């Protein structure tokens, strides 16, 4: 008769595998258990003595009775697989919990701004045994397992330990190395449905269309941009020239065979071009990992992963470092407003709307076909702010351009009557998003002086670039979308008709000093058949170039 808890384990439904696997005292005897599929024989080696383990009939569970307790350092498993290959490994289920109560508390409270330092997968050593520690948040799961090639993607082999009310799961797997693809297999506690998910905190991912996370290398990049960082700290960005070159790494330049260049190749080609044109900074369209090329990076699945299209995290660090050494700053377009519905990523992560609102009137962008973060959930604050600070801390970025802020601020953004829910006061302001944005900007400014937080905000929301202690949102600067739209409409007119539209020029001056504005000529204005800038200009070729020169001169001399 198989005990109920072992049946639960064999069915991959046990909430706490540490109650069954590992070494346990029962009836004054020590029972050591191992679950391992695709093996013919299993042994335990203690003090160089090799002892066979007994297979539970018709299962992949092995056990042996021992006369005493042994620390995990003093025994090791050995298995013989179906191909007659021997392998040795330590027991993952005889280690103590590793997650600190303080980390779990701060994460659940929305106050852990460096959660990436303990969440996700990372190299770890416990009891002088090396391996990888996995930690994931899935509060509505009944069982979470780490799966990968190292366990045949079998969710029964490495089920994780629940940390209780925090909703966080952990498992230290000894003897595995970096570079392996992995995912989490998650069983929902109510429906029993099983899903395979990439790690939300993964620092590296597979090259699309593959979707697994990769156990990151523990090697630290050796930075050489100390002079730039020291200078940036004292940079008076309000009164110094700031000329930004916006670029999309996937299309700026490609190899002769049409493939992507690497971060390192782009850096070395980019520097002389940027220096020649006199730009002070480059701004990258999102390189946080994304599955669909056509999204330009704005449908993010890996908030801590530089896109594998162009290389690994070490390569991206080189990109930033190389530009810094040549006195060029680097900004990144960062997308906390929404995320895609791809099954392998954040959507319905533990079988519920964990990262998103389950209510479609709050949780879905119909225009973009994406999901909206649930800013009222404190763990989302920890997740997103940790992502923002990760790029500033680990990759020395000089600032973030926060995408689609207007869609975060308004509950009725791009919605008709009856398609949205008002806030508790009956208004259309997303109060939870406002709280999140202020917390984000306060955290970034306090920790990274000189780094800029820039808002792409297309409405007249007041005090976007004012400090939070003055009632503002706390951004450093705001994109002046109104100036861009009005100016491009004016410049596209035939000069004969411009005299009737001077309001397109004068209106921007009426509010020019209400915010710290950046004057943009955005990628959004040259896509979807909107024509290039020179294509928008009227007249023949000579006149088009003359008008474009006028546009640039007007832009650079605009008061503000």
Give a label for each model feature.
Residues 1-29, 51-138, 152, 163-246, ...:
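The feature marks proteins involved in alpha-glucan
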Residues 35-41, 137-144:
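Short proline/glycine-enriched turn/loop motifs at strand-loop junctions of beta-rich domains
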Residues 39, 141, 279, 396-397, ...:
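A structural motif
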Residues 42-44, 144-146, 182:
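Short beta-strand elements bearing conserved aromatic residues within extracellular beta-rich modules
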Residues 45-48, 147-149, 187:
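Short strand-turn-strand beta-turns centered on an Asx-Gly dipeptide
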Residues 202-206, 226-242, 248-428:
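Substrate-binding/active-site clefts of carbohydrate-active enzymes
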Residues 396-398, 416-560:
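Conserved alpha/beta catalytic core and glycan-binding cleft of carbohydrate-active enzymes
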